[in-house]
Each structure stands twice: as C-alpha cells, then as structure tokens.
C-alpha cells in the first residue's frame, strides 16, 4: 500500500452536516477499497488565490491515508462529481520522510516580564548641545 495525502476545498457556506457528509463519503471510499484511513484535519475557511465558481473563500480539508491506485481513481472521481467540492489534489507521499510534529513550547510569563522590564529600565542617552 502507498501513502497518500489529499487536500480538498469545499464551498465556504456549507453547514457542518454537509461537511460531515462529504468527509464520510471520502472515508467510505477508503474503507471500501481496504485502505487505511489515518487522519482528517479541518483547516478552516481561507481566502482563495483566485475565485472558483464565484467563491472567494473555501473550507480546506486535509486527508492522510494508505491505499492503492484503484482507490485513488475512485476517490478523485467522486470528488470531481460532488458539486460541494471546489478543488482537490492527491499526492503520493510514500517516499517522503515523516516529519515529526513539533509543538511550540510556551515562553514562561516571568521570562517575558523580565525582558520587557529590562527594555523599559534601560536609560536612554541624552544628547546635549
């Protein structure tokens, strides 16, 4: 099995139920072709680079899964036929190295306060004429 990523853009005015219906259809295709569904992320509504079907914004969804070529063909066919989907793209990531998820460490509040206090406490040079 190969690893794939698919990003698809939905119309921005869809209800949560409509978004769930589209996501369920995609997951059904993956499971019916004995694929391994790994992750679905909703990236939210973002501005498009150019209008698509008179929509300036779109809801981005990211999907990661394992499967075969037949599954990709069927998945893309169903996305193409769905009027709620503005655009989609699938990418084979089998040979791509796994990137570890890096979480940002919160800066302690005390350290920020000390840095800002030092900046305020530093006297300014005076210029005399």
From Swiss-Prot:
TM spans (from-to): none
GO-annotated molecular function: small ribosomal subunit rRNA binding; structural constituent of ribosome
A Gene Ontology cellular-component term: cytosolic small ribosomal subunit
Pfam family, one: Ribosomal_S6
CDD domains: bS6
Alphabetical GO biological process terms: translation
Key words of the record: Ribonucleoprotein, Ribosomal protein, RNA-binding, rRNA-binding
Disulfide bond positions: none
Family listed: Belongs to the bacterial ribosomal protein bS6 family.
PANTHER family for this protein: MITOCHONDRIAL 28S RIBOSOMAL PROTEIN S6 (PTHR21011), SMALL RIBOSOMAL SUBUNIT PROTEIN BS6M (PTHR21011:SF1)
Physiological role: Binds together with bS18 to 16S ribosomal RNA.
Protein name: Small ribosomal subunit protein bS6
Organism: Pelobacter propionicus (strain DSM 2379 / NBRC 103807 / OttBd1)
Gene this chain is encoded by: rpsF
């Amino acid at each position: 099995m190969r690893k794939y990523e698919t990003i698809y853009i939905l119309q921005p005015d869809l209800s949560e139920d409509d978004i769930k219906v589209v996501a369920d259809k995609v997951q059904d295709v993956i499971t019916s072709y004995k694929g391994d569904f790994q992750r679905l992320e909703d990236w939210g509504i973002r501005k498009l680079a150019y209008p698509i079907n008179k929509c300036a914004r779109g809801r981005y969804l990211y999907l990661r899964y394992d499967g075969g070529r037949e599954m990709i063909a069927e998945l893309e066919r169903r996305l193409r036929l769905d009027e709620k989907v503005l655009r989609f793209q699938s990418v084979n990531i089998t040979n791509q190295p796994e990137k570890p998820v890096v979480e940002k460490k919160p800066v302690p509040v005390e350290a920020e306060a000390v840095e800002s206090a030092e900046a305020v406490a530093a006297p300014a040079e005076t210029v005399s004429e």
